[in-house]
Each structure stands twice: as C-alpha cells, then as structure tokens.
Amino acid sequence: MKTLYSLRRSYPVETLFNGTLALGGRDQATTGFAWWSGNARLINLSGKLLGAHVAHAGLIVFWAGAMNLFEVAHFVPEKPMYEQGLILLPHLATLGWGVGPGGEVVDTFPYFVSGVLHLISSAVLGFGGVYHALIGPETLEESFPFFGYVWKDKNKMTTILGIHLILLGAGAFLLVFKALYFGGLYDTWAPGGGDVRKITNITLNPGVIFGYLLKSPFGGEGWIVSVDNLEDIVGGHVWLGSICILGGIWHILTKPFAWARRAFVWSGEAYLSYSLAAISVMGFIACCFVWFNNTAYPSEFYGPTGPEASQAQAFTFLVRDQRLGANVGSAQGPTGLGKYLMRSPTGEIIFGGETMRFWDLRAPWLEPLRGPNGLDLGKLKKDIQPWQERRSAEYMTHAPLGSLNSVGGVATEINAVNYVSPRSWLSTSHFVLGFFFFVGHLWHAGRARAAAAGFEKGIDRDTEPVLFMNPLN
C-alpha cells in the first residue's frame, strides 16, 4: 500500500532554533549592557533584534488600529471632527475616505475597516515578533544569509539602506495611486467649500516641485509648507517616490565610495543616530506643516490654522456690521487705520485691526472674495455666500490658540468651549518628539564616535545605580 505521509515526519525541523525559551546570554556579563539598555543587548544577535523590531512594529500598528476603532466608536457625525479630539479620522478623511462635499462625513464604514485591518496586521506582526524573540534562531547569518548582517559590513549596510528606500518610495506612490485611480483625495479648494476629487493634472515640472525647496522658510515664502494645491502635493510624491526607488536600486547595486567609507562611522549605534537625526527633521517639518498648511491638513477636519481663525473673526464682524449699515470701505478704527479694511505693506486690500499681521493668509472660504488688488470691495458687498459666513463663524470660535471668548487669543488663556484643536495637539506633539529624537541623535552619535575612536562616553558603568538593583528575574 502506498504511504500517504512522509516517513520523516518525526524528525526534528532542520532550521536553526533556540531550543529553550529562557533568555540566556542576554545579561550584562555577556553583552556589556544591563537589562534597561533594551535592544543594545541584541546588537550582535540579528535574529533576536529582528524579533524586537517586528514586535515594535506590531505595537505601533496595534495602537493605530485600536485608536482608529476608539475614534470611530466615539464619532458624532453632527459635530466637526476637530471638535471631537480626533487625530486619526482626519487623516483618513483627507485621503477621501467616507466624506462628501464640504467635508461632511457620509460613511464611517471605511474608518471601521481601516481599524480592523490594522488590528489584524498587528496580530501577525506580534506573532512574528514573539516567534523571533523567543523561538527563532539567535543569529540569521548562518541559516538565512540574505537576512543576516554584520554592522561593519559596509556593502551589506548600503544594501539594507537601498531596500528601505525602495519601500519608502513605494509608500509615496501609494498616495499617488489613491489620488489618480482609487477615488481621489479631499480637496479643500474645490468650488463651493471642498469635495473629494481625482487629481488628474499632477505637477511634474521639476522647476515647480524643487522650487519649493529653494524658497525662504520665513514669512509668506514658507518653504515646502507653502504648498497650496493637491496637484503639487501629488506631483511631489511622484518625484519623491521615483528618487527613493532609484536611490534604493543604486545603493543595492553599488558599494560605498572611499570618501563615504572614511566619512561615516560604521556601527549599529551610528546607524541608530543617523536614523534619529532623520526622524527628528521629519518631526520638525510635520510640526510646521500641520500648524500652517490648510491644504494637506484641511481645516474642515483639523480645525482652522491660527491665522485662519483670526481672519475669520475679522470677516465675521465685517459681515455683521455691513448688514447693520456700516460702510466697511471707509470706516476708521480707533487708531485712524481702516476698521474693517486697510492696505498691506505691498498695497493689497486686507482686513484691518489686529488680524493685519495675518494679511497673507490664503483660505478656500476667503479666496473667492479677492480681486487683482487683494480683497475686492464689490465682492465683499454683493458676493458673500452663506457657506462662507457659516464657515468663518465656525472657524472664529475654534482657534488653535484658544482664548477667554473662544476667539483667537494667546496660549495662556483658557478657552470657553473646552476645546483643544487637533492642530495644536499634532504640531506640539511632533515638535516635542522631534526635539527628543534630536537629543537622542546627539547622545548616540557621541557614543558611536567615541567608540570608533577607542573610548566610551556615557554613564560610568562602575557606579551606575542599576548595578545595585536586583535582577529582573
């Protein structure tokens, strides 16, 4: 009779395994690092370090999924997102999921699906992390040489860099595909107060895209944060994705040049410091982007920017007083300047009063009222639409810097509606994270350079308090 199963079924699996679940070889005597140094104990154990990284990714994705579902469960469709303390649903809405004209949420099911998908993938990552941390081979070099590495192997390190760059480029292209083929993105500038649309006429002109990088970061110039249309944003992602993928292929196929081998420190801690520096810069840029930019971060979801709330207040009172008979073109304020309208330093007609310092604000609810010389007096008298009045009144009372009367004020004053703008939250958190990542960069870069020079910087191992504490086990 034919045997339907392998006669070797009881033989041990031939992959290299760590036969015990005990975490041997992870103590200070073996690694030179105490338990609280975390992954430093795994510097030369590529299999275990893989487990730590995969488990860490699982925790991140788990937070995203759980917080996503938490926000869906608490979401009230009748209130704007920015009034509900949401920080994840605004991102999904900006990508065009579940929203219609004016940023109104018409379907929360895509948000639910997003949360569930993240939870499921976090379980897969969590399993992989536990497997590699406890059961899988301690090192990958012998059994899986493609995934193994030695920190000082410069060619292998640039190959790993190349793989990372290709994955980042693919991520950039995901946004491009969403904008072009999969329903489009939410465009706050769409006529009538914003809508979801496919971005078909993307900007590929390198002069425009790279021109942003050459702009001044100050004032109305605003560096890359000044981008005010989705065509440029999606085009920028095409360029960025292409550069990352081509750069990744380059780093996989080539070996580092002699000047690069001499210039860099080639150790695990050095690579950590480079990564921390990069993510610190990203944190600071994200801080500025979410605070000032109302195209990539539409005010319908994140609340108004500071300048936007201030200009909305001036606009709201102009509308009110004009209805009461005021001549907004000629009325003077207490200083003799225009009470409602005045001239900017470059001659345009702008809102008067304290909000004059925000004269170069651009916002979708205000731009239709401008002419070639700034605000158009004729349009202000005849063309103001109800949706513009409603939106400015709403934004006026939801400034990211709250104040006593719920209008734009300074950060030290209480806000009457117990309101924290997602812009305040996201920009502050990214600034703080960017700062601490920068401090981490300085710390690890200093240690890496010291180690490369043959001495150690940091806490004195002979006197550190943890040596006098009981071991965890």
UniProtKB/Swiss-Prot annotation:
The organism's taxonomic lineage, starting at the top: Eukaryota, Viridiplantae, Streptophyta, Zygnematophyceae, Zygnematophycidae
GO biological process, one term: photosynthetic electron transport in photosystem II
Entry-linked Pfam families: PSII
Cited SUPFAM superfamilies: Photosystem II antenna protein-like
Modification type Phosphothreonine: residues: T15
InterPro entries assigned to the protein according to its UniProt record, in alphabetical order: PS_antenna-like (IPR000932), PS_II_antenna-like_sf (IPR036001), PSII_PsbC (IPR005869), PSII_PsbC_sf (IPR044900)
Topological category with respect to the lipid bilayer: Multi-pass membrane protein
Organism of origin: Zygnema circumcarinatum
Keywords: Acetylation, Chlorophyll, Chloroplast, Chromophore, Manganese, Membrane, Metal-binding, Phosphoprotein, Photosynthesis, Photosystem II, Plastid, Thylakoid, Transmembrane, Transmembrane helix
Family indicated by similarity: Belongs to the PsbB/PsbC family. PsbC subfamily.
GO MF annotation terms: chlorophyll binding; electron transporter, transferring electrons within the cyclic electron transport pathway of photosynthesis activity; metal ion binding
One cellular component (GO) term of this entry: photosystem II
Keyword Metal-binding: yes
Residues where N-acetylthreonine is found: T15
Bilayer-spanning residue ranges: 69-93, 134-155, 178-200, 255-275, 291-312, 447-471
Subcellular location: Plastid, Chloroplast thylakoid membrane
Main function: One of the components of the core complex of photosystem II (PSII). It binds chlorophyll and helps catalyze the primary light-induced photochemical processes of PSII. PSII is a light-driven water:plastoquinone oxidoreductase, using light energy to abstract electrons from H(2)O, generating O(2) and a proton gradient subsequently used for ATP formation.
Name of this protein: Photosystem II CP43 reaction center protein
Residue positions binding [CaMn4O5] cluster: E367
Subunit relationships: PSII is composed of 1 copy each of membrane proteins PsbA, PsbB, PsbC, PsbD, PsbE, PsbF, PsbH, PsbI, PsbJ, PsbK, PsbL, PsbM, PsbT, PsbX, PsbY, PsbZ, Psb30/Ycf12, at least 3 peripheral proteins of the oxygen-evolving complex and a large number of cofactors. It forms dimeric complexes.
Keyword set includes Chloroplast: yes
